[in-house]
């Protein structure tokens, strides 16, 4: 809890620095709004119901894409990590595709899925899939073989071996991939919404920019940061619950 005592102070310091930059820099507040104007902007968008609706729309797209990517990434990661011969053939292809930005696939995504919320979901899936896949494969390949030998000596077979021995042993490695995937998926969700959606926080940024409402533009930007922080915090809570349930010390 001690680390949270610094949070109010850090936000107050950021507020003051922001205010000083605007005042001393002589910026036009219509172009670079003060913190107070942004605070009023929060009130305006909350009062209109726009902010919460866009947050909800973004979260729906995010969770659909993220959950599908986690399930697929862990599933294929377990298989490819367990069968190293198959992974040796798949790995070069993965290493070529993995560095490509999900946005680069957008013309083909639109071609196959059309315009709307589906392209954003597909972009989220691509962004989150590879961190989860690679962390799962790495965790499986680095599992201590003693765990498997002892389990087999006690007569433990599949699927009990998977759920009681393998998954608890590799979960810390998978968890790191889940955190990386969360961040990249949230970033690219906003990018996807900027291109093809008519709702969501990414669309809100484009809409406010086109309407020259930089105060509301800043509201959307800050909201993306705060929601991303809450999502990461939520994943951490789930992670701790799983650690506790499986009796894993972190």
Residue ranges and their predicted role:
Residues 24-67:
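Periplasmic/extracellular loop-to-transmembrane helix junction in inner-membrane transport proteins
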Residues 53-61, 111-132, 175, 216-221:
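Loop-to-helix entry region at the N-terminal start of transmembrane alpha-helices
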Residues 72, 76, 97-102, 123-137, ...:
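Faces of alpha-helical transmembrane segments in polytopic inner-membrane proteins
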Residues 75-110, 134-143, 149:
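Cytoplasmic-entry segments and transmembrane alpha-helices of multi-pass inner-membrane transporters
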Residues 84, 176, 218-250:
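C-terminal transmembrane helix and the adjacent membrane-cytosol boundary/short C-terminal tail
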Residues 110-111, 187-224, 243, 248-250:
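Glycine-rich helix-loop "coupling/hinge" segments at transmembrane-helix boundaries
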Residues 122, 126, 158-191:
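Transmembrane alpha-helices
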Residues 139-175, 205:
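Short cytoplasmic-facing helical segments at TM-TM junctions of multi-pass membrane proteins
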């Amino acid at each position: 809890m001690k680390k949270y005592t610094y949070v109010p102070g850090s936000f107050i310091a950021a507020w003051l620095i922001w205010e000083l930059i605007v005042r001393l820099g002589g910026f036009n507040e219509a172009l670079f709004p003060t913190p107070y104007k942004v605070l009023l902007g929060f009130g305006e968008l909350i009062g209109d119901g726009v902010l919460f609706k866009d947050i909800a729309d973004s979260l729906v797209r995010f969770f659909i894409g993220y959950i599908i990517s986690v399930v697929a990434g862990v599933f294929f990661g377990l298989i490819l990590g367990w069968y190293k011969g198959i992974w040796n053939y798949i790995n070069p292809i993965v290493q070529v595709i993995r560095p490509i930005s999900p946005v680069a696939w957008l013309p083909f995504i639109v071609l196959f899925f059309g315009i709307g919320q589906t392209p954003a979901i597909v972009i989220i899936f691509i962004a989150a899939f590879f961190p989860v896949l690679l962390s799962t494969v790495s965790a499986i390949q680095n599992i201590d073989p003693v765990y498997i030998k002892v389990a087999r000596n006690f007569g433990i077979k599949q699927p009990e071996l998977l759920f009681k021995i393998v998954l608890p042993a590799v979960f810390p490695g998978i968890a790191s991939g889940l955190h990386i995937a969360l961040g990249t998926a949230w970033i690219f969700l906003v990018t996807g919404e900027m291109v093809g959606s008519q709702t969501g926080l990414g669309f809100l940024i484009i809409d406010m920019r086109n309407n020259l409402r930089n105060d509301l533009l800043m509201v959307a930007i800050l909201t993306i940061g705060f929601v991303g922080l809450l999502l990461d915090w939520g994943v951490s809570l789930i992670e701790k619950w799983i650690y506790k349930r499986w009796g894993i010390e972190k």
